[in-house]
């Protein structure tokens, strides 16, 4: 409480009032969902609270009924397919991750969920009956009396006219007639209803395989200790025999139900061709010639970097002693002997600490088991259940809950049970020493080796090693090759030591895995663990394809943010831990991602919304058993309170002038015209918001006045906040996105004589743990400045209790990672987080999109990516400055004016209550008073019809998927019975067809080994249609595509259509948005109608694989799939020498394209060709990528 008062006094002294970030998100979402013209809210809330509560129960009941129907349809669909699926079940075996095992698991989960939903429905019905028993009874009596009294008038109704009878069904309840929007939002838009089982899984009390025969591995009870008499011996033998029989029966069930099949009849599946390009690796990149002058500049820069403070001698010495003790093999053997002594001590007290045994034979050391939290014990049990299925999984626990401890405990238990094989852990370079330290603490018997230059004690000053995982190359698909300082022979010796040891554990980085893939990818590992595994979220990135070639079926991903942006990223993660579980990427996008995305559009039809819901149900059942995610609030983690404030800072005079000058420049016009990359303009604006001197860094970095805090609004806020925090005894973490901003911050801290430490991509890996240890264990260091991509990943910085996030990131999970560095297990003080955002600028747009993406991520199966492809109006929205125009109205002021009327911004004028930010936005003497809003209770003002553009922008941020899908969902629930049955039936057919297409895609992918990357539409080999390789080849990372066995191709193309009709890349979001904008509801519904006819259409087109034109002309009523159409366009232009006139193209395709699809056709043509005008007229010329 004292800290809260101190914070409030600090903010008031700065002219700032704090805002609770969760309240901001809730208010923004609720404002975006509220109709501005609706003025009936206050009257409803006047005196009808019981009616509102009853309405909420009714809406909840309807949403539960909708989900019951959806889950029941999946069970019925599975049962209907069982008789026809007997023949395929005869082909069971090892290499096919599909069929009976997966179907049995999904059906069991669906049946359990259906039971829980029915219980919830009965409970809601009971609550409804209990809420108003007497009025309902009186209403029934009134209705009965009315029926008796109106006997005579009832005979007069038929002659009145049949028109009224016809019109009555038209008066169905619509959303506009439903004033209880909050009830609709709670009941329908909140996603799937959480059952009791799912709640227990979320709280860490159960595993996803609880009470599923053949999948659950329970803890076996310890055997009784008194066994002297013969009867006890007989019971012991009986128990041992029963245990063996039970294990044998369990293994038999696993062999039968495991999601794998063996194909005995290869003629029943499509054939695959060999890859179009031979398997080869890229050569060394060319080095640009460097002039002597530039070489001297490069030498000067590292000298400047060495000025940063190093860890204290005490901590450097302690860290070097720890590393040398772990590096030295002799000391390692001594450590093993010490652990043996510890084992002797444990055996002395074995009566108390015996091994805990799970079904199947996993023995968890007693000393280890007692140190784990309950949810961590459940995590170890879940990993063992996955091990018995020969499958992998994603540990998606929230940051700070001990994912590393759970993995090491499980690997140690495997070693203790004699089931361990040498394993590999891939992680960012910052976490290498932390992994080694945790491994030596939790299971000292592991012989840990680090495959990285930082572990080489002989090369003390190898600076290049620290650059390999810098934030500059973090998200790059084409990372620079880092020359290893160790000779290849030494790497070979290190790898051979790990592989030959029965307890070897290899730690390396993603970059080293990419460089040394030839050595590491040929080894059969026991386990492959990817820490911060969202690094492979891009399915076509080179590092992703390298990781998917690791030779093991036991794969684990550790990430605190398993779902960040879109469904294709979720596919990439799951395809690593369970190859082929979600099919190939083009089929997954067509059958799941596109329907779910289209169902979330504002103009989605009821059929599209229902289809999206059914597809989401199927996808959830596929994914959830292999994704374990627990939150801090659910597992009763003993953590202190965390509060988060958002401080909106004003631009200084210099910043505002620079910002406006850039917006008026020709460069912005080039961005609007599409002649320049928009990311360039976004980067310039964000630099201006941080500090305008960043634009002149190359020329003015040596100027003594470079980085003056008076020229940056956020720097002035930081200066005042740090001064107060220093006096109050707090310790601070400050995160920025770039090293350049850290340079300015470092100069500022040096001038203010603050004790600080710095860590970024240029910090040598050997110093990072020493820096972290020094900051956590001594109070001398006041502030630790870091970049979010290096210091915000997996590090433990509990020594701080104040965090400043200087600039927001487009990806909310990045800021979330940085925030969780201090608020985690081990923290003893309350944590306060400050986010600094420059008001009215692009940073405010980034922050609002963060809220939007976070809101959609919580719905798990929604795709927030649709706003990532910016159109013209989005660009104009980004490249604007809204600070003192339009009476000082900004997006933020609109939000906070609805939060509270009592907002103190340092200008106590009543006349300016409606212009909260006008005074602080205009230049004042100080120029940069930050402003924010306080969490309060004030009446909410609805935006009028003539609302500002900012209100409309806020609505457009949220009207895309989550909110309006709830509206359409409610319209479906209120539809009449006939229409509802038809919609549900059609949606069920689409969902079942999607599941069938996914099943066939898995069968196709199963031809290849688990170590062959899955086809993504651009890269990979497993499951790729042969026609794609024949026409386009592998357009990316051909060096990572393994050669498969050549096979016959007589029916390759037709069968590729049978697994989803996707040849080539899937429909992009930009094309999809253009299609929906051009054809409104018709185009989207036609696309889904085409999916309804996909199965029958593929049967017709398979017979004409050589000539797609004949089949398409005979089915004119059917819309051609965009992926097929773009391939036909490319083939036609190639046949005409790479160029064709508009007349010839139109003449050729006029009988295939419907009039309402002409806009899609034009966009597809622009995607692969450019229009060139010459003397002979205009011609379309293929782009180089398609020639």
Swiss-Prot record:
Comp. bias regions, Basic and acidic residues: 92-101, 217-230
Annotated disulfide bonds: none
Alphabetical list of Pfam families matching this protein: Helicase_C, SNF2-rel_dom
Biased composition (Low complexity): 918-933
Protein name (record): DNA excision repair protein CSB
Biased composition (Acidic residues): 339-351, 468-480
Helicase ATP-binding domain sequence ranges: 384-580
Family per record: Belongs to the SNF2/RAD54 helicase family.
Superkingdom: Eukaryota
Biased segments, Basic residues type: 300-319
Stretches the record annotates as Disordered: 31-53, 75-102, 217-242, 265-351, 457-480, 916-945, 1095-1116
Quaternary structure and partners: Homodimer. Binds DNA.
Primary location group: nucleus
Comp. bias regions, Polar residues: 31-43
Gene Ontology biological-process entries: transcription-coupled nucleotide-excision repair
Subcellular locations according to the entry: Nucleus
EC number: 3.6.4.-
InterPro entries documented for this protein: Helicase_ATP-bd (IPR014001), Helicase_C-like (IPR001650), P-loop_NTPase (IPR027417), SNF2-like_sf (IPR038718), SNF2/RAD54-like_C (IPR049730), SNF2_N (IPR000330), SNF2_RAD54_helicase_repair (IPR050496)
PROSITE patterns registered for this protein in UniProt: HELICASE_ATP_BIND_1, HELICASE_CTER
Extent of the signal sequence: none
First-tier enzyme category under EC: hydrolase
Induction pattern: Induced by gamma irradiation.
Residues covered by the Helicase C-terminal domain: 716-876
Organism: Oryza sativa subsp. japonica (Rice)
Expression sites (tissue/organ): Expressed in proliferating tissues. Highly expressed in shoot apical meristem (SAM). Expressed in roots, young leaves, flag leaves, and panicles. Expressed at very low levels in mature leaves.
């Amino acid at each position: 409480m004292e800290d809260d008062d101190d914070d409030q006094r600090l903010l008031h002294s700065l002219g700032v009032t704090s805002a609770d970030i969760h309240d901001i998100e809730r208010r923004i979402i609720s404002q975006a969902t509220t109709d501005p013209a609706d003025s009936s809210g206050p009257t409803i809330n006047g005196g009808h609270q019981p009616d509102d509560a009853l309405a909420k129960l009714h809406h909840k009941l309807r949403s539960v009924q909708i989900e019951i129907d959806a889950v029941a349809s999946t069970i019925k669909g599975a049962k209907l397919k069982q008789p026809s699926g007997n023949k395929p079940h005869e082909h069971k075996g090892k290499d096919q991750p599909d069929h009976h095992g997966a179907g049995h698991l999904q059906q069991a989960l669906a049946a359990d969920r259906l039971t829980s939903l029915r219980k919830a429905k009965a409970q809601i019905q009971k609550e409804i009956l209990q809420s108003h028993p007497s009025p309902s009874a009186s209403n029934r009596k009134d209705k009965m009396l009315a029926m008796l009294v109106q006997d005579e008038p009832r005979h007069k109704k038929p002659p009145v006219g049949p028109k009224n009878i016809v019109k009555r069904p038209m008066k169905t309840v619509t959303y506009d007639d439903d004033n209880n929007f909050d009830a609709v939002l709670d009941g329908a838009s909140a996603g799937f209803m959480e059952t009791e089982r799912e709640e227990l899984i979320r709280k860490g009390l159960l595993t996803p395989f609880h009470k599923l025969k053949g999948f659950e591995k329970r803890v076996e009870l310890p055997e009784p200790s008194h066994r002297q008499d013969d009867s006890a011996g007989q019971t012991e033998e009986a128990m041992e025999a029963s245990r063996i029989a039970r294990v044998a029966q369990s293994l038999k069930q696993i062999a039968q139900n495991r999601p794998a099949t063996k194909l005995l009849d290869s003629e029943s599946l499509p054939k695959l061709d060999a890859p179009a390009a031979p398997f080869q690796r890229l050569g060394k990149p060319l080095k640009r010639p460097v002039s002597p002058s530039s070489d001297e500049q490069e030498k000067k820069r590292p000298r400047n970097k060495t000025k940063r403070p190093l860890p204290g001698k005490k901590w450097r010495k302690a860290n070097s002693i720890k590393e040398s003790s772990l590096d030295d093999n002799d000391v390692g053997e001594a450590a093993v002997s010490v652990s043996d002594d510890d084992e002797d001590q444990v055996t002395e007290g074995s009566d108390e600490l015996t091994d805990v045994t799970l079904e199947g034979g996993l023995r968890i050391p007693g000393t280890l088991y007692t140190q784990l939290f309950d949810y961590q014990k459940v995590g170890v049990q879940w990993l063992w259940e996955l091990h018995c299925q020969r499958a992998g999984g994603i540990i998606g626990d929230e940051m700070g809950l001990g994912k590393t401890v759970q993995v090491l405990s499980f690997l140690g238990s495997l070693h203790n049970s004699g089931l361990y094989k040498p394993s590999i852990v891939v992680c960012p370079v910052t976490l290498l020493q932390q992994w080694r330290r945790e491994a030596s603490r939790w299971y000292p018997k592991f012989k840990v080796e680090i495959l990285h230059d930082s572990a080489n004690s002989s090369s003390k000053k190898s600076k290049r090693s620290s650059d390999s995982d810098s934030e500059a190359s973090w998200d790059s698909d084409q990372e620079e090759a880092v020359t290893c300082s160790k000779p290849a022979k030494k790497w070979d010796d290190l790898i051979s030591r790990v592989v030959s040891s029965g307890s070897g554990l290899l730690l390396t980085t993603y970059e080293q895995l990419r460089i040394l893939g030839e050595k590491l990818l040929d080894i059969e590992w026991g386990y492959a663990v990817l820490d911060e595994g969202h690094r492979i979220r891009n399915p076509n990135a080179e590092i992703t394809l390298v990781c998917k070639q690791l030779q093991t079926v036991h794969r684990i991903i550790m990430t605190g943010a398993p779902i960040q942006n879109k469904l294709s990223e979720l596919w990439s993660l799951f395809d690593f831990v369970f190859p082929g579980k979600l099919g190939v990427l083009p089929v997954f996008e067509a059958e799941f991602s596109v329907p779910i995305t289209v169902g979330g559009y504002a103009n989605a039809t009821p059929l599209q919304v229902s289809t999206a819901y059914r597809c989401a149900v199927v996808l959830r059942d596929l994914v959830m058993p292999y994704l374990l995610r627990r939150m801090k609030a659910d597992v009763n983690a003993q953590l202190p309170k965390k509060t988060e404030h958002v401080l909106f800072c004003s631009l200084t005079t210099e910043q505002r002038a620079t910002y406006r000058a850039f917006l008026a420049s020709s460069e912005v016009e080039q961005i609007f015209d599409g002649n320049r990359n928009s990311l360039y303009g976004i980067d310039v604006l964000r630099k201006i918001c941080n500090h305008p001197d960043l634009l002149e860094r190359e020329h003015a970095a040596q100027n003594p006045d470079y980085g003056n805090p008076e020229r940056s609004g956020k720097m002035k806020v930081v200066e005042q906040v740090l001064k107060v925090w220093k006096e109050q005894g707090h310790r601070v973490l400050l995160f920025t996105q770039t090293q350049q901003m850290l340079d300015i911050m470092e100069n500022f801290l040096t001038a203010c004589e603050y004790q600080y430490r710095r860590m970024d991509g240029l910090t040598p890996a050997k110093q990072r743990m020493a820096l972290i240890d020094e900051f956590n264990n001594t109070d001398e260091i006041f502030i630790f400045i870091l970049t979010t991509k290096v210091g915000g990943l997996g590090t433990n910085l509990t020594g701080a209790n104040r965090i400043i996030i200087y600039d927001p990131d487009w990806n909310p999970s990045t800021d979330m990672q940085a925030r969780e560095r201090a608020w985690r297990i081990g923290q003893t003080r309350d944590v306060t987080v400050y986010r600094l955002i420059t008001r009215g600028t692009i940073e405010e747009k980034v922050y609002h999109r963060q809220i939007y993406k976070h809101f959609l991520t919580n719905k798990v199966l929604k795709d927030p990516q649709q706003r990532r492809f910016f159109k013209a109006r989005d660009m104009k929205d980004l490249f604007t400055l809204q600070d003192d125009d339009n009476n000082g109205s900004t997006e933020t002021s609109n939000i906070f004016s609805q939060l509270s009327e009592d907002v103190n911004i340092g200008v106590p004028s009543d006349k300016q209550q409606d212009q909260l930010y006008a005074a602080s936005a205009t230049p004042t003497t100080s120029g940069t008073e930050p402003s924010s809003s306080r969490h309060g209770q004030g009446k909410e003002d609805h935006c009028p019809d003539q609302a500002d553009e900012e209100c409309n922008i806020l609505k457009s941020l949220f009207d895309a998927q989550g909110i309006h899908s709830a509206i359409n969902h409610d319209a479906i629930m209120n539809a009449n019975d006939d229409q509802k049955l038809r919609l549900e039936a059609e949606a069920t057919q689409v969902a079942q067809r999607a599941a069938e297409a996914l099943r066939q895609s898995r069968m196709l992918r199963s031809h290849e080994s688990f170590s062959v990357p899955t086809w993504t539409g651009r890269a990979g080999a497993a499951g790729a249609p042969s026609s794609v390789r024949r026409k386009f080849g592998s357009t990316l990372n051909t060096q990572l595509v393994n050669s498969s066995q050549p096979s016959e191709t007589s029916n390759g193309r037709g069968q590729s259509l049978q697994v989803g009709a996707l040849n080539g890349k899937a429909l992009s979001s930009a094309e999809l948005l253009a299609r929906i904008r051009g054809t409104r509801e018709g185009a989207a519904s036609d696309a889904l109608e085409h999916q309804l006819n996909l199965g029958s259409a593929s049967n017709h087109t398979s017979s004409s694989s050589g000539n797609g034109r004949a089949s398409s002309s005979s089915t004119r009523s059917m819309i051609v799939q965009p992926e097929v159409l773009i391939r036909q366009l490319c083939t036609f232009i190639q046949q005409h020498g790479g160029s064709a006139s508009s007349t010839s193209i139109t003449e050729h395709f006029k009988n295939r394209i419907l009039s309402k699809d002409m806009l899609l056709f034009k966009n597809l043509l622009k995607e692969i060709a450019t229009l060139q005008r010459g003397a002979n007229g205009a011609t379309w010329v293929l782009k180089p990528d398609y020639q």
